[in-house]
């Protein structure tokens, strides 16, 4: 019931393939502006938008850059489990590599569990565990 919903909301952050961005960081009232600026650099969008007066200066970004900003906000929520639905699909090859080979391992070192839904089989080797689904069903590991 409500207890489970509250638990899930406090433990999961997500960036789905369909998402919405806000200029303000709602619900993140004690956020240090310097931490936001560091993440803008990490996401390689500090030259496109900045964080001033508790808001982003622009959301007028490419689709890939908007997804980076959405991931930045999810990271700031500081929840232990991060669900990313086809997150890398809109990223250029360079940032996609950075995401899988640098950013995901960093999130793991920070103690986060990342569930990355992806078709990027080139990067399956980065995962601790790969779960394959076909037609909405999990395929046994031997068949995957």
Feature names for model-found ranges:
Residues 104-116, 120, 124:
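Conserved catalytic loops of ABC-family nucleotide-binding domains
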Residues 55-65:
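Conserved ABC ATPase signature
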Residues 69-71:
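Hydrophobic anchor residue at the start of the ABC signature
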Residues 15-57:
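Conserved "ABC signature" C-loop
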Residues 119, 126-143:
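H-loop (His-switch) and adjacent beta-strand-loop-beta switch element
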Residues 92-102:
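Conserved D-loop/post-Walker B switch-helix segment of ABC ATPase nucleotide-binding domains
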Residues 74-82:
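A short, proline-enriched helix->beta-strand linker immediately N-terminal to the Walker B motif
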Residues 82-89, 96:
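Catalytic Walker B motif of ABC-type/P-loop ATPase nucleotide-binding domains
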